[in-house]
């Protein structure tokens, strides 16, 4: 196959919604067929003259052992031999037309006299030229007959139209024959699904055959009106007089041959019925896909290839989707309209016969074109527009303004000022406390023993912290969705995001960490659960977090041979306290994989990818601002030097020496001190001696 000379480029689009809603409309049409070029062949020396081989008797006898095949118009395409040629023979009966002109009548009489000789030459021509054309019915090989039988509509000029959804399977003829058989009870869900779709395609073919039989047999019954494709026969410019029917034989061929009309049944779904267009998806074998498919699968792309069975599998469209970035790559790019048929495919056979097809496809769902250069500029423009729309632009008071205009001007200014203040009126954390919001994303998991995994997580908050969340919603523990057919050597894209908000007291120490525990569980087709591994990560609440994704190595207990048999045949999860296993404060010894105790050895399994982000919020310490403006001079002489005043301000504004100055903080400190005094007095009264109690009573 040779690609056309048109420029093909890869279209890159950003998918804003669900990729499963993507639909393509593809149109394919047979344009034309190129006949073989003229051929000059040497038939061998023939000694038919009386002067010997080296001395021909006449000028015409020079060319008697040579003949040429010249392609003519469509009306003469085929000839007697049906090879797609109009043969001009240079022999004694016809003569050398380049040097001698003869009338058509005399030429026809000469042809009738030399009919036997022409029959012999025709046999020689059919043996020497094994080329065939799709335009010829008599000389078409069995493969061409089968292609024409399956795709009569396409060969007769109809446009194949099909709509393909994302990851929608369309079978080729070989796949249809493979999945039409009953897969049995041990088949997978994918095989059963393909078998069901193959039966639907078979029913579509049988329904079409019944329509054809009804159209031929029942003449009085009202049947769907057939489509009539009429074509004007091209005639030669100079019509020869007295030419018999033998000079222009009539043959049956395709639409580009000499045919006046072809009747076919109206079938808009003939592309799906004839398996003309088929697709290859992620579930199919990589051996059927192009060479770059395995490399794309390793990078996490989802692939889809669209082929056309044009006497050989021809790749029309290749689509790949990056779920991490949300980008869709389409090669070649979408046409402005599927009816434009922008792309051309040229099919070459072993002989000089060529088939020309054109196709176009468009997207029927909205997509946003992705441009790296214009994306930032467009975003900046949108931000400026939002800022201008959200906040009124400052305007000046007109010089000659009436009283009503002045009142309206200041009213708008007050509304704008209140709107600006409302932007800062968000909920603050309690005093002497800090709010920490953690944004967690469990991205993917891979290299576990079994597929169909999901992850359960649990967070353990440190001391001097309080969980802050929506009532009835517990984000400290949860589970992800199950990834079907992923998690072993295939990457399971979990994509689970959640948020945890904590309040930290003043007594919180930076060494106190938030512990995050993971348990990876697989579920097989019999709904048996198996533990695939445990993981742990300690999150600091006050210090910085890594900006990149974190790769966590999962482990699980190795166990003995009985545990291995139970895991394989029965499944289930062992009672393993992984929280205490990862707690370093409760252990006096280090874990080792070389421990001979069967309860202690662990084995590594797969990995999890975790991404963290953190937001901190606290109230502004007003003591620094207060001491910055009002500093106290306690027993120190003031000097006029500016440097000494600045030093006094810095010393007085030190957080270690500063005290609470607001009324709320003073009252809170007073209440706390009163509680401590009452508690101390209560303890002292209980432990007092009887003599001291007696003296207190007398007093």
UniProtKB/Swiss-Prot annotation:
Biased composition (Basic and acidic residues): 108-119
GO cellular component: centriole; ciliary cap; ciliary transition zone; cytoplasm; MKS complex
Keyword Manganese attached: no
InterPro entries in the cross-refs: C2_B9-type_dom
Domain C2 B9-type: 434-560
GO BP: axoneme assembly; ciliary transition zone assembly; cilium assembly; non-motile cilium assembly
Tissue specificity annotation: Expressed in chordotonal neurons in the antennae (at protein level). Expressed in spermatids (at protein level).
UniProt key word Iron-sulfur: no
Region (Disordered): 101-121, 373-396, 632-661
Keyword annotations from UniProtKB, A to Z: Cell projection, Cilium biogenesis/degradation, Cytoplasm, Cytoskeleton
Disruption of the gene: reported phenotype: Viable and fertile. Minor defects in sensory cilia function probably due to lack of localization of the tectonic-like module proteins, namely tcnt, B9d1, B9d2 and TMEM216, to the transition zone. Does not affect the recruitment of Cep290. In sensory cells associated with the notum hair socket, results in structural defects including axonemes with abnormal microtubule connections to the basal body (BB); results in subtle defects in the localization of intraflagellar transport (IFT) proteins and an increase in the ratio of cilium volume to inner membrane volume.
Subcellular location: Cytoplasm, Cytoskeleton, Cilium basal body; Cytoplasm, Cytoskeleton, Microtubule organizing center, Centrosome, Centriole
Subunit annotation: Probable component of the tectonic-like complex (also named MKS complex), composed of B9d1, B9d2, Cc2d2a, Mks1 and tctn.
Function: Probable component of the tectonic-like complex (also named MKS complex), a complex localized at the transition zone of primary cilia. Required for ciliary structure and function.
Name this protein carries in UniProt: Tectonic-like complex member Mks1
Organism: Drosophila melanogaster
Gene field: Mks1
């Amino acid at each position: 196959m040779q690609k056309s000379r048109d420029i093909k480029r890869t279209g890159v689009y950003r998918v804003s919604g669900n990729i499963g809603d993507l639909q393509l409309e593809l149109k394919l049409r047979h344009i034309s067929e190129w006949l073989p070029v003229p051929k000059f062949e040497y038939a061998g020396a023939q000694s038919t003259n009386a002067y010997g081989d080296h001395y021909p008797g006449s000028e015409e006898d020079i060319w008697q052992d040579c003949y040429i095949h010249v392609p003519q118009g469509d009306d003469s395409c085929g000839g007697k031999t049906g090879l797609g040629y109009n043969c001009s023979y240079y022999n004694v009966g016809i003569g050398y037309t380049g040097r001698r002109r003869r009338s058509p009548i005399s030429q026809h009489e000469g042809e009738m006299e030399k009919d036997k000789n022409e029959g012999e030459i025709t046999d020689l021509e059919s043996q020497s030229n094994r080329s065939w054309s799709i335009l010829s019915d008599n000389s078409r090989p069995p493969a061409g007959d089968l292609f024409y039988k399956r795709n009569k509509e396409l060969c007769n000029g109809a446009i194949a139209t099909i709509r393909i959804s994302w990851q929608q399977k369309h079978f080729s003829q070989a796949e249809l024959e493979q999945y039409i058989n009953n897969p049995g009870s041990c088949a997978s869900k994918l095989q059963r699904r393909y078998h069901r779709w193959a039966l639907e395609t078979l029913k579509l073919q049988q329904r079409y055959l019944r329509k054809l039989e009804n159209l031929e047999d029942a003449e009085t019954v009202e049947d769907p009106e057939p489509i009539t494709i009429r074509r004007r026969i091209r005639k030669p410019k100079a019509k020869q007089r007295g030419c018999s029917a033998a000079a222009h034989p009539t043959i049956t061929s395709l639409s580009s041959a000499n045919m006046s009309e072809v009747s076919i049944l109206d079938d808009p779904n003939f592309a799906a019925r004839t398996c003309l267009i088929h697709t290859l998806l992620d579930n199919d074998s990589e051996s059927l896909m192009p060479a770059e498919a395995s490399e794309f699968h390793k990078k996490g792309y989802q692939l889809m290839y669209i082929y056309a069975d044009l006497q050989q599998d021809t790749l029309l469209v290749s689509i790949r989707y990056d779920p991490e970035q949300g980008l869709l790559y389409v090669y070649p790019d979408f046409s402005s309209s599927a009816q434009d048929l922008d792309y051309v495919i040229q099919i070459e056979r072993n002989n000089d016969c060529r088939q020309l097809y054109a196709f176009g496809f468009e997207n029927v769902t909205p997509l946003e074109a992705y441009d790296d250069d214009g994306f930032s500029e467009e975003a900046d423009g949108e931000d400026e527009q939002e800022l201008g729309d959200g906040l009124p632009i400052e305007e000046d008071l007109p010089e000659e303004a009436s009283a009503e205009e002045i009142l309206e001007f200041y009213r708008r200014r007050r509304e704008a000022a209140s709107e600006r203040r409302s932007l800062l009126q968000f909920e603050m954390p309690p005093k002497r406390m800090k709010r920490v919001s953690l944004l967690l994303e469990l991205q993917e998991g891979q290299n576990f023993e079994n597929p169909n995994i999901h992850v359960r997580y649990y967070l353990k908050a440190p001391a001097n912290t309080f969980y802050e969340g929506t009532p009835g919603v517990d984000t400290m523990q949860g589970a992800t969705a199950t990834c079907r057919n992923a998690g072993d050597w295939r990457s399971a894209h979990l994509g689970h995001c959640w948020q945890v908000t904590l309040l930290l007291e003043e007594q919180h120490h930076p060494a106190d960490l938030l512990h995050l525990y993971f348990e990876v569980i697989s579920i097989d087709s019999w709904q048996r659960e198996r533990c695939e591994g445990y993981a742990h990560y300690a999150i600091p609440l006050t210090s910085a977090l890594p900006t990149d994704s974190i790769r966590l190595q999962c482990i699980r207990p190795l166990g003995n041979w009985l545990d291995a048999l139970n895991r394989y045949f029965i499944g289930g999860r062992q009672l393993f306290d992984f929280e205490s296993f990862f707690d370093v404060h409760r252990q006096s010894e280090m874990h080792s994989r070389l421990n001979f105790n069967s309860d202690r050895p662990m084995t590594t399994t797969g990995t999890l990818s975790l991404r963290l982000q953190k937001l901190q919020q606290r109230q502004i310490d007003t003591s620094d601002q207060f001491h910055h403006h009002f500093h106290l001079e306690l027993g120190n002489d003031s000097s006029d030097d500016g440097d000494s005043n600045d030093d006094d301000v810095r010393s007085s504004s030190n957080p270690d020496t500063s005290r609470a100055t607001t009324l709320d903080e003073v009252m809170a400190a007073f209440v706390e001190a009163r509680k401590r005094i009452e508690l101390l007095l209560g303890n002292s009264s209980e432990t007092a001696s009887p003599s001291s109690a007696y003296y207190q009573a007398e007093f």
